[in-house]
């Protein structure tokens, strides 16, 4: 038995080894060490703050004497000079430095607190009396830059200290502050300047030259003053500022190039700084913590000799992501071997991409020093990666469950019809607005022929102004039996929800169940008889049948719409229904009247009142059932404009629901974990469309910037292309595979459904963004009848898509023209622009197909 199992697992084991090796190799390729200029490990001096990762002067947590001694021993390997910032803290440093023959620039921190300033200066002068290894003094650190005090006050402090000091005295400010206040130079013995080109948006390759130029500018302005660079350096982490990019490689490059240049210039300088200081994040933002040659744990971040890898922790990340995925990869290769190599590879790539993305996100706290304040900022930076990872994992979960689960646990069928005297009374509500009367009459006529005894039909026409649309309904309803009722509301608020609430008020007092159908649905006679008996179980609040369509077979656009809709009802609805997290729909739905009225009826503030009601019912511990059998068929949207309008409304309504229900989705409610998961993540695919729109507009803008300002804007291909490729891969691979698995349709129909889905990307993105930024929406009825359009009306539905498409084409052409067709970077960038254009080409194709005869 063991041998038999081993033989079965060998192919999967080999596949997992090869795939993991390839994955690790890609990590190695992306993180190959970069050669930099080699310099001697000698530094003129270090700016020094001795706080460690869990320490901060802001809350009174200071390093011990032993920790300070350890720091000085590390710095002693590189220098004999250090610079301090305050005389009230870390008092052991100066005597510890003296034992190691190290000189100290002592500092007095000056800010808005005059009493504290006095204590700082007193402590500074006391140290000057006691320790001979203090060779310079700095009173104030960027106090003028922060506007903590006027220049006259600072000059007063400087004059006082100079009178009581036997060593040179200065204050530390950036170069431009010294140029702004020439009078300040008369009150110092030397100029203590900060030269930090990162803060000025200078690219790292020009940063050293820029530093020397600013130094020379000060020399020319004040030729008789000695200049000491008391801060010079580059951070290893932080936000991009103009062309300045913070990274360990850039930090190593700047320091090495500066040290090499200093061998010629012979400058008096202090590197900013010896050790990373996480506590500075609270004062200075991200970059403030990451200026050290050593990290907060006292490990050197880079060497001054040899090549430097872009990411020193890549081996750990690659190893963990490979190890975490290894056994699942082996099981994928074994479990899905009947798919063939293509299926196995597609699953493996998807799963490894998920694990790798999550591993990178998980390791970000190890790359950054987290505090409560900067946690939100850091989350913002990794939002793109985290969102992509979550979307991938959500799709992976749905894909795996639908593809491989032998049977659905919650699979309900038609119920056994009950005798007439045991039937629950049903009130069927049909709301319509400005609909073709013949279409609505067909729906009413189908309701007349239901195989059910105890029911009524309430038709509510709200806000239709054209009598030719609602008068025929009134006339036809007058010929119906007494259980058919018609109401015309000339002016009624609340859109469809308002009409349904009106119908609810008019409902027969004996009704136990409320049914809702759209105005275009022709219902089968067995709808009520086969589904209403489910309400005999008291916990059942909703019985939902799928949306289905008719009259779609003879036009390719309607075929596209039909199969695009079918995907959700054959796949997504089952996936959610398995955990009682159903998306309720506003047609072919049956609701327990008591539950509906207890919750206050339909929500008129939401333009997706059906889904919102379903979530409220779930929040009240009720069960929603899905019967995947067709009991009625409606019409597909008449054209692409109508399809876009419908999907835009759904996306907008989804955001209304999320915003309104977020406290219960995240806080205290009766929703279980699975229900919260589905409603919080179920629309993440649509969030991806919004993110893709942002990326696309950003790419166009970035292309323009690269063409207009090539010295300051480079090609961020990897940053932009990864999320786009992920979303496109999901749609291009998972969708067709699931369609082929769950539905009986041709590859052409799968292509059509995929084309429609991709073409709707912009409409969904607009709906998501508008839903997030606006509170109220407008319920636009989906047009189901086609009319002849003018040439402008043919273009109008996709004018935004065309504008973006033309912009992408022009951006790509301009980039190739400017950089040359043989430029590899330009080719990659234009390839990314081409990928980003696919949704807009699809929208153009959908519009053309929808208007064909």
Can you say where each PLM-predicted feature lies in the sequence?
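Long helical/loop segments within the catalytic core of UDP-sugar-dependent glycosyltransferases
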Residues: 475-512, 525-607, 612, 618-619, ...
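Membrane-embedded multi-pass helical conduit in multi-pass membrane proteins
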Residues: 339-390, 418, 685-778, 793-853
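Cell-envelope/extracellular polymer assembly enzymes that use nucleotide-activated donors
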Residues: 424-427, 456, 597, 612
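Aromatic-rich peripheral "rim/lid" segments of glycoside hydrolase catalytic domains that contact
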Residues: 40, 45, 51, 57-60, ...
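Short, acidic, metal-binding catalytic loop of nucleotide-sugar glycosyltransferases
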Residues: 444-454
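A conserved acidic beta->alpha catalytic loop
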Residues: 453, 461-473, 490-493
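The conserved acidic donor/metal-binding loop of glycosyltransferases
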Residues: 518-522
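Aromatic- and acid-rich polysaccharide-binding/catalytic face
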Residues: 106, 135, 141, 173-214, ...
């Amino acid at each position: 038995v063991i041998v038999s199992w081993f033989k079965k697992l060998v192919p999967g084991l080999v596949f997992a080894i090869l795939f993991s090796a390839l994955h690790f190799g890609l990590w190695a390729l992306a993180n190959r060490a970069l050669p930099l200029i080699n310099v001697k490990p000698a530094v003129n001096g270090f700016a020094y703050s001795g706080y460690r990762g869990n320490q901060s002067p802001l809350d009174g947590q200071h390093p011990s004497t032993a920790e300070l001694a350890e720091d000085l021993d590390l710095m002693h390997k590189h220098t004999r000079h250090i610079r301090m910032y305050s005389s009230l803290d870390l008092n052991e440093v100066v005597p510890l430095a003296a034992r190691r023959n190290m000189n100290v620039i002592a500092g007095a921190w000056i800010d808005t607190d005059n009493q504290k300033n006095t204590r700082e200066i007193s402590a500074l002068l006391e140290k000057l009396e006691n320790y001979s290894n203090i060779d310079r003094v700095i009173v104030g650190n960027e106090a003028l830059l922060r506007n903590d005090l006027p220049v006259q006050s600072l000059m007063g402090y400087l004059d006082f200290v100079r009178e009581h000091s036997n060593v040179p005295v200065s204050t530390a400010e950036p170069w431009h502050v010294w140029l702004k206040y020439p009078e300040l130079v008369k009150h110092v013995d030397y100029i203590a300047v900060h030269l930090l080109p990162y803060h000025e948006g200078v690219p790292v390759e020009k940063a050293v030259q820029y530093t020397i130029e600013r130094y020379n500018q000060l020399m020319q302005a004040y030729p008789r003053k000695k200049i000491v660079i008391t801060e010079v350096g580059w951070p290893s982490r932080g936000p991009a500022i103009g062309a300045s990019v913070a990274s360990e490689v850039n930090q190593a490059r700047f320091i090495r190039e500066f040290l090499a240049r200093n061998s010629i210039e012979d400058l008096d300088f202090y590197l900013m700084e010896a050790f990373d200081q996480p506590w500075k994040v609270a004062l200075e933002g991200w970059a403030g913590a990451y200026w050290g040659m050593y990290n907060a744990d006292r490990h050197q971040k880079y060497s001054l000799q040899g090549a430097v890898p872009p990411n020193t922790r890549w081996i750990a990340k690659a190893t963990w992501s490979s190890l975490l995925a290894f056994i699942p990869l082996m099981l994928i290769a074994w479990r899905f071997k009947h798919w063939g190599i293509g299926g196995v590879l597609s699953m493996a790539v998807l799963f490894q991409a998920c694990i790798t993305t999550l591993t990178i996100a998980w390791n970000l706290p190890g790359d950054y020093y987290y505090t409560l304040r900067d946690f939100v900022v850091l989350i913002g930076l990794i939002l793109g990666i985290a969102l992509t990872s979550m979307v991938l994992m959500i799709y992976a979960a749905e894909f795996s469950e639908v593809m491989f689960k032998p049977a659905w646990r919650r699979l309900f069928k038609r119920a056994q019809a009950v005798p007439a005297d045991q039937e629950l009374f049903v009130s069927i509500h049909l709301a319509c607005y400005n609909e073709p009367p013949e279409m609505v009459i067909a729906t009413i006529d189908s309701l007349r022929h239901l195989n059910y005894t105890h029911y009524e039909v309430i038709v509510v026409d709200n806000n239709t102004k054209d009598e030719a649309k609602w008068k025929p309904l009134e006339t036809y309803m007058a010929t119906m039996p007494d259980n058919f009722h018609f109401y015309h509301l000339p002016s009624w608020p609340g859109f469809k929800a308002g009409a349904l609430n009106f119908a609810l008020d008019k409902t027969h007092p004996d009704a136990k169940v409320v049914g809702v159908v759209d105005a275009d649905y022709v219902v089968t006679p067995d709808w009520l008889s086969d589904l209403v008996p489910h309400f005999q179980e008291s916990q059942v609040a909703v019985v939902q049948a799928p949306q289905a369509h008719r009259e779609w077979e003879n036009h390719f656009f309607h075929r596209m719409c039909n199969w695009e809709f079918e995907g959700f009802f054959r796949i997504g609805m089952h996936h959610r229904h398995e955990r009682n997290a159903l998306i309720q729909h506003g047609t072919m739905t049956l609701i327990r009247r008591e539950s509906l009225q207890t919750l206050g009826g339909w929500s008129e503030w939401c333009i997706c009142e059906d889904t919102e009601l379903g979530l409220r019912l779930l929040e009240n511990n009720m069960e929603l059932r899905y019967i995947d059998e067709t009991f009625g068929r409606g019409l597909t949207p008449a054209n692409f404009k109508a399809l876009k309008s419908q999907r835009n409304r759904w996306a907008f309504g989804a955001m209304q629901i999320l915003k309104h229900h977020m406290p219960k989705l995240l806080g205290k409610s009766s929703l279980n974990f699975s229900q919260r998961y589905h409603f919080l993540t179920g629309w993440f695919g649509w969030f991806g469309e919004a993110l893709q729109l942002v990326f696309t507009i950003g790419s166009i803008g970035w292309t323009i910037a690269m063409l207009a300002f090539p010295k300051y804007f480079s090609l961020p291909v990897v940053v932009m292309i990864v999320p786009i490729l992920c979303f496109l891969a999901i749609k291009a691979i998972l969708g067709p595979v699931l369609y082929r698995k769950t539905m009986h349709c041709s590859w052409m129909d799968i292509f059509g459904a995929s084309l429609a889905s991709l073409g709707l990307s912009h409409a969904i993105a607009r709906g998501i963004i508008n839903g997030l930024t606006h509170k109220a929406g407008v319920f636009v009825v989906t047009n189901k009848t086609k009319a002849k359009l003018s040439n402008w009306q043919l273009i109008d539905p996709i004018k935004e898509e065309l504008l973006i498409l033309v912009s992408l084409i022009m951006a790509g052409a301009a980039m190739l023209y400017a950089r040359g067709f043989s430029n590899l970077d330009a080719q990659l960038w234009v390839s990314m622009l081409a990928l980003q254009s696919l949704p807009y080409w699809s929208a153009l194709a959908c519009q053309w197909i929808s208007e064909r005869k």
